[in-house]
Structure formats: C-alpha cells, structure tokens
Amino acid sequence: MNILDDLKARGLVYQTTDEEALYKRLESPMTLYCGFDPTADSLHIGHLLPVLMLRRFQLAGHCPIALVGGGTGLIGDPSGKTSERTLNPTEVVQEWANRIKEQLSCFLDFEGVGNPAIMANNYEWLGTINVIEFLRDIGKNFSLGSMLAKESVESRMSRGISFTEFSYQILQSYDFLKLNELYGCEMQIGGSDQWGNITSGTDLIRRMSVGEDRQVHGLTVPLVTKSDGTKFGKTEGGAVWLDPDKTSPYKFYQFWINTDDRDVVKYLNFFTFLSIEEIQGLAQEVESQPEKRNAQRMLAKEVTELVHGVEARERAEKISQALFTGGIANLTAKEVEEGFSDVPSADVEDQEMLLVDALIKVGAVSSRRQARESMESGAVYVNGIRQTDTTLTVAQLDKIESRFIVIRRGKKNYYLVKLV
C-alpha cells in the first residue's frame, strides 16, 4: 500500500502540494523532514503527531530527517501565535535542542539498515550565515506581497509583528533548500499552521533550481482538536510533556484514558499504529458498549508504551487499577510517588501522632472534631482500608515500604503522609 493511502484513511492528510505527483513519488523511497524548534526543554504531546508521522514514513521505507531548530529557535515562529515570543539566550536554546534530540531518538531508528533516520540542527548553517550574501542570494526570491499574505503573518498585522518573526518564513524556507542540497530531501511535513512556510520553501527551491528537474513536495497534518472545545494537550496542570520528569507516565496515561468517546477513534488513528481494521473494531465497541471504555484503554496503553516504554506503561496501569479497586497497599513506594505526586501531602516525624491529627496535618480536615466525625462515619481510608478507630496512631497503621501512608477521605480526595 502507498503510505499516502494509509495516511488519508486515518485522516492524517490536511493539505498537500500536487497530490497526484506526490502519490507517484511515494511509490519509491524518498527523503522528507519535519522541524522542531526548541521552545522548551522537552517536546509535548502537541509535537507527537508530526513525530509519529516521521516514524510512519520510516516504517514505510522512506528516510526521515528530524530537524532541530537550534537556529530558528532563537527567532520564534509566529505561526499560531497571537503575540511576540520571548527570545531565549543562545546557550539555553542549544541546551534545549540537545534534549529534544535525545527525545526524538526514542521514536526514530538512526542506526537502521537501508533507511536510517537523520538528525540535523539548522544552527549548523544559520549560525554562520553571511547577511549580505543571504539577502542577495535568498532574500531576492521572496516578494513582500506574498510574505504579507501568509496567514501566519496576516493574522498578526493588526497586533504587530517584529521583523525578526516576520523573517522566520525565509529561514524555514532556507532550511528546506539546505536539506534538499545536503540530503536530497524532497518533502517537508508539518502542522496545518505551517502550510504557508512549507509552500514558501517549495517556491524557493523551484526558483533556485531553474533548468533543473528538482521536484519537491509539502504535506500538512490536521490540527488536533477536542470535541468539548478545550485545547488538546492541555490539562488543569498545564501542558502534557513527553519528558517523564515533567509529566509522569501515570499522568500521561491518565490524559489518554480520559479521552472523550467522540474523540477516541480519531486519536487511535492519529496516535497509534493499530491497523485500520483494529480501530474499526474498537469504534464499534464505542458505539455498542461505551461504558467499557475499551477504546480509551487501548489508546492509553499504545501511546504510553510508545512514548515511555513497556515498564512505565505497566506501572501506570497498575496505579490506575489500584485507585479504581482501592488496592493501594499493593503499590510500591515508587508507584505511590508517581501516582500521588500532585495530591496534598505532609511530612510526619512523630509516629505516635494520632491519625486524627495526621488528617489535619495533610489538610484532609480542618479540626479534630471533623476528623473524628469523618472516621466514625466510614469516610476515611488508609492505604485502601476503612479506618473508624479514632484512637489509632500513625505507628499502628500499615505503611508502604515504611515511607508512605495514602489517605482517602470520601470517594476521590487523596492525601499523602510522608514518613521522615
């Protein structure tokens, strides 16, 4: 199957340059790229779709280039932004670029035989650019009218846009030209907001290769949306990162398992490598037995394992199951730290402290009277076990590896006692 057929079946193609020519070109191996600007020290799930697109192309026999924007990251892309980006110091951007390189290596095979992926950093050519030569040789190929007409620029004109960000599309176009010259790269892929920058690149290559038969292409993926109108990739706690130190695998797993029934089939097509037939089967289950949430569990399993590995995925599933069944006592200390990293907590040194007082210290209740009433009514659980004896001390309670006590008050309010 031509990879374009699979991508279209999954809803992953938003726009392409000459689709017929691209389809024919993809019948044999080609080199393509996608760029990732280091705007933070980690990629987030907003980057996941284009990253997985590179992986899909590599699995189909094509050669992907992951371009880290060590140069363009110093400038800032106005696409999709309503205000000017904060410019970060060069050393910070380069450090972030190195971290992003490490993350990308988890998704692409850079050592494979036949079509190994390529890692590049545009600082290599943008960092040493000669301004006069650049304006003479590259800048003359861009008309001000067409640059102003690009959606990424036009949408910012009323609010104001600096020359720095205005010139971003020229630098991105130059990236495509350099990758075409260095590696024979014939296609750029990106999000739908990148269409203007991508076509600027194809136009530049065409103008710079008059008399040559250099055909290049562009493809964009759709904007990932949520049916409830909220922004994809954002939670109450902020962005969902691919770095496990910024978003734990458990929290990552929970993001996917909480997917709306209206979105889950789309996300299975976008973010997993399950076959179309497997996804159609899960889609039928969403229609007939939505309460089982099998599609959400499969989505969370596949994406968490893809990003964080089997062990982290199994750990996330175990924590989720423990919270659902009340089997907190079966968790390890590491699993408790991961699963309860953002609940109210308190350090307790005196193990002769009454559980009643520990409830106050972690913020579960505001007074001893409220603590006693909660316990006597059966609303307090320690490591999944209901506790009604108001005379219990911390020393008398079971602990998780002698380090933690997990308290639940009511159905969903969790607190963590850390024994020090």
From Swiss-Prot:
PROSITE patterns: AA_TRNA_LIGASE_I, S4. A motif ('HIGH' region) lies at residues 38-47. Its EC number is 6.1.1.1. L-tyrosine binds at residues 33, 168, 172. One of its GO terms (cellular component) is cytosol. It catalyses: tRNA(Tyr) + L-tyrosine + ATP = L-tyrosyl-tRNA(Tyr) + AMP + diphosphate + H(+). Residues 353-419 form the S4 RNA-binding domain. Keywords: Aminoacyl-tRNA synthetase, ATP-binding, Cytoplasm, Ligase, Nucleotide-binding, Protein biosynthesis, RNA-binding. ATP binds at residue 234. A motif ('KMSKS' region) lies at residues 231-235. It is an enzyme of class 6 (ligase). Transmembrane segments: none annotated. It is found in: Cytoplasm. Pfam families: SYY_C-terminal, tRNA-synt_1b. Belongs to the class-I aminoacyl-tRNA synthetase family. TyrS type 1 subfamily. PANTHER family: TYROSINE--TRNA LIGASE, MITOCHONDRIAL, TYROSYL-TRNA SYNTHETASE. Homodimer. Catalyzes the attachment of tyrosine to tRNA(Tyr) in a two-step reaction: tyrosine is first activated by ATP to form Tyr-AMP and then transferred to the acceptor end of tRNA(Tyr). This is Tyrosine--tRNA ligase. The lineage of its organism: Bacteria, Bacillati, Bacillota, Clostridia, Eubacteriales.
